[in-house]
């Protein structure tokens, strides 16, 4: 059935990554993004598989999962996150939660961004972050996808204003309340695509350790494929060149044009590594 297919697809993908990571001696972090209420059973099923994998390998299939219940009441959101983290913490896994709504659309799920609309719901309240910290810290490791005007996708400039200082305010409130170190929270920057470099730098300085750039990487992949298709348009209309009679298989072979997408994708990742200060660094070293 469709549900089982989604579970097995995620499990087999993780197993493939673990196999290659071990072969090449690299550190691979596997994470599932934005699971709303209807996808909670899918996450539970993946944790089931991680429990079995952990028994044999001493590690979980996935490093972390995300629950995005930001549209729900804060207590309902956090209580479900606490339940899930109880399971995951036993496997040394981390849970990512979302507080405040990140606008735009991510894989068909999102919130409309309209010019002139009230965007107050796009900003996380530090008090909610403190509430999450109080409930989840005793259970296990978690990170917070806090909303500070960031949106999924790329939108017309001016529709939403990034306010990374909200991240600083959350860090300061938790630190002051509990007497912790300067930045006790692990924060995630969703909707990083198209963001200004100075805003990215500010977010990192306030404790962001992960930034999502799905839209930019999708575009980079499509751009690489698109350029290749433009350069070899005849091969995408005919199997044999109508003028020369030469076979065109070596041009329309999917391995050729998909590789161009990969190379363009890699170039965008290299840019992100520089922006985030992670170029040349590895958790495995």
Where are the regions that the model predicts?
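Extended, intrinsically disordered, low-complexity segments
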Residues: 230-285
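Exposed alpha-helical structural elements
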Residues: 128-131, 220, 224, 264
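Catalytic-face loop-and-helix region of soluble metabolic enzyme cores
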Residues: 21-22, 151, 156, 166, ...
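Alpha/beta enzyme core
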Residues: 1-3, 7-25, 36-183, 197-202, ...
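Conserved acidic functional residues
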Residues: 33-35, 68, 190-192
């Amino acid at each position: 059935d469709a549900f089982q297919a989604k579970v097995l697809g995620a499990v087999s993908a993780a197993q493939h990554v673990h196999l290659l990571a071990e072969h090449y001696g690299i550190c691979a972090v596997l994470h599932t993004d934005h699971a709303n209420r209807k996808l909670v059973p899918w996450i539970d099923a993946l944790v089931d598989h991680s429990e079995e994998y952990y028994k044999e390998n001493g590690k979980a299939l996935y490093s972390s999962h995300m629950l995005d219940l930001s549209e729900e009441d804060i207590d309902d959101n956090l209580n479900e996150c606490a339940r899930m983290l109880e399971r995951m913490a036993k496997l040394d896994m981390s849970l990512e939660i979302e507080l405040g709504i990140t606008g735009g659309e991510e894989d068909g799920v999102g919130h409309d961004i309209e010019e002139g609309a009230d965007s107050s719901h796009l900003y996380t309240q530090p008090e909610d972050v403190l509430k999450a910290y109080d409930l989840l810290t005793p259970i296990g490791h978690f990170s917070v996808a806090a909303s500070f005007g960031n949106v999924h996708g790329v939108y017309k400039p001016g529709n939403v204003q990034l306010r990374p200082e909200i991240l600083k305010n959350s860090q300061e409130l938790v630190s002051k309340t509990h007497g912790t170190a300067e930045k006790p929270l692990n924060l995630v920057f969703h909707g990083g695509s198209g963001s200004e470099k100075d805003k990215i730098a500010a977010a990192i300085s306030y404790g962001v350790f992960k930034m999502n750039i799905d839209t930019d990487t999708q575009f980079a992949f499509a751009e690489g494929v698109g350029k290749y298709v433009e350069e070899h348009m005849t091969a995408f209309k005919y199997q044999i060149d109508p003028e020369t009679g030469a076979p065109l298989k070596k041009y329309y072979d999917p391995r050729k044009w998909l590789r161009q997408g990969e190379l363009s994708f890699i170039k965008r990742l290299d840019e992100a590594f520089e922006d985030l200060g992670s170029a040349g660094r590895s958790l495995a070293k």
